[in-house]
Amino acid sequence: MSVNSVRHTCVNKILIVGLGSIGKRHIEIIRDLFPEITIGLLRHSKCNEDEIKSYGIKFCFSTIEEALAYQPDAAILANPASFHIDVAIPFADAGVHLLIEKPISNNIDGVRKLISLCSKNGLILMTAYNLRFSPSLNQFRDLLHQGKIGIPYAVHVEAGQYLPNWRPNLDYRQTVSAQEYLGGGVLLELSHEIDYTQWIFGSVKWVKATVLRQSHLEIDVEDTAHLQLGMSNGFNDKQLVVTLNIDFIRHNSTRQCHVIGEKGSLLWNGIQGSIEFFSPNSDEWEVLYSNLTERNYTYEQEIRHFISSIESGSSPHVSGEDGLNVVSVIEAVKKSNVEGSLVYLEQHRV
């Protein structure tokens, strides 16, 4: 989206779509950071007046038509991914700026139409990959692009957590993560890793993947994915392959990226907010950076950036196109898994 195409708007009213854990988080953050903004809610369940008041919500709606009549300046879609596009299109058509929780959708159907509509109407369309606002991940990216370890030769990305422990106050079987029709599964739920991999190393050119449901968890989606990603490589003209492993089954929560380079190795630990450097000269790991921020920090920065982008008319840090590129990779992964072959992505690019 061109910077000049975005119209400037003062954000007075925001609509939150969905009142799950992430919807509640967004409401609390907006209420704390922007108390002057009026918050409305659109949900498929009946509005409970006491519950709504407890979250500081002024208005609650049960239909898109009612929510459109509220005339919000912006909307944050925190409903299941399989419903994102059907909700987003009418709001974009009405001139409402959009922040859509990751993934932007559970497939690419309608995503290009949404991107085009937002561009035509001069709207911000932002995908909510909040890891882009992690101080440690930004520092990690900067160190790589500044040549700390020279040319990257190999990249190993891992993320996983035991699904029943993810939201301990909920029955995991009833969560979005566990249900295919809501857009669950490890590929969509842990798509942060696909996004930041492209943000750091360049776009994915091809994939080779194995996707499994191998645990005894009561889910109807994949719980494990092993990916090989051939990157366009933003560092040089050599082939760079990323191995990416994500799962719902490990009991030791993990989020890390290990890059092997010509001048050493660099390791990002997203759980600890740390970066370590292995130098061939010292033959040991050295902590270069450590900043364990509060969990809400990246979400707060994301909301600040969304509202700032609307009010300044500048393009967002994580665009609708970024969201589409992630879903395109996921669709190629699924195709590779079924066919047992390498799949190229050029035909899916924006």
PLM regions and their residue ranges:
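Active-site loop of classical SDR/Rossmann-like NAD(P)-dependent oxidoreductases
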Residues: 47, 291-304
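Predominantly a Rossmann-like dinucleotide-binding segment in NAD(P)-dependent oxidoreductases
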Residues: 134-218, 340
